[in-house]
UniProtKB/Swiss-Prot annotation:
Swiss-Prot/TrEMBL GO biological process terms: phenazine biosynthetic process; pyridoxine biosynthetic process
Keyword field contains Oxidoreductase: yes
Protein family: Belongs to the pyridoxamine 5'-phosphate oxidase family.
Annotated metabolic or biological route of this protein: Antibiotic biosynthesis; phenazine biosynthesis
Cofactor note: Binds 1 FMN per subunit.
Protein name: Dihydrophenazinedicarboxylate synthase
Length: 212
């Protein structure tokens, strides 16, 4: 029975998911496949990651960021080390992220250690950004109190007017979210949504199909 009309899901359902029954040996391969498919399906913001961090006493915060890239070890993103998420990552070293693609009815959960990148990698991230993005990232101290909005705007405008790449602020850093657990979720019209979980097992991965 098709019960999708009772759901709040507004995108496609029953997208192809052959890996559900024949999963790759590790999850990054599947993540890359899904991202490539999302591009073809014209998902509007495939890199919008809802990233949750926490303090050492368990107080959770979350925000949506755009991750930078994916390599064979995980998902790379950047932030200010002095921001709330930066401070919480320093406290615990762990984070959990969720990609939700309304257009295709898919979700990907990524949970694991957020490992700081080397300074050379931070530089590569910074100088890989378009020059106009440097101004506000240099002028702002992310998550600090905003005392004078116009002063910050003016400072960023002065930097932008220079028209050159700016030095990377030391507080601008990158992390790699290296998964210890990942889950791939695909909506189904019969509500038997397909959930495939990967769990780190030493140097290998264990896969499990989960009930919806």
């Amino acid at each position: 029975m098709n019960t999708s009309r009772f759901e709040s899901l507004t995108g496609s359902v029953d997208v192809l998911f052959p890996e559900y029954d024949d999963p790759p040996s590790e999850p990054i391969t599947l993540l890359k496949r899904w991202l490539a498919t999302a591009d073809v399906a014209r998902v509007r913001e495939p890199k919008a990651l809802a990233l949750a961090t926490a303090t050492s006493d368990g107080r959770i915060s979350s925000r949506v960021i755009a991750f930078s890239s994916i390599d064979d070890r995980g998902v790379i993103f950047c932030t200010h080390s002095t921001s709330r998420k930066g401070r919480e990552l320093t406290e615990t070293g762990w984070a959990s992220g969720l990609l939700y693609w309304r257009e295709t009815g898919q979700q990907i959960m990524i949970s694991g250690q957020a490992v700081p990148l080397e300074e050379s990698e931070n530089d590569k991230l910074w100088f890989g950004r378009s020059v106009p993005m440097h101004a506000m990232s240099s002028a702002s101290h992310q998550s600090d109190e905003l005392v004078d909005r116009e002063a910050l705007r003016a400072h960023a405008a002065e930097l932008l007017a220079l028209g050159v790449a700016l030095p990377r602020p030391p507080r601008f850093v990158g992390y790699r979210l290296e998964p210890h657990e990942m889950e791939f979720w695909a909506a189904s019209s019969d509500r038997l949504h397909r959930r495939l979980r990967y769990e780190r097992d030493g140097n290998d991965w264990k896969t499990t199909q989960l009930q919806p």
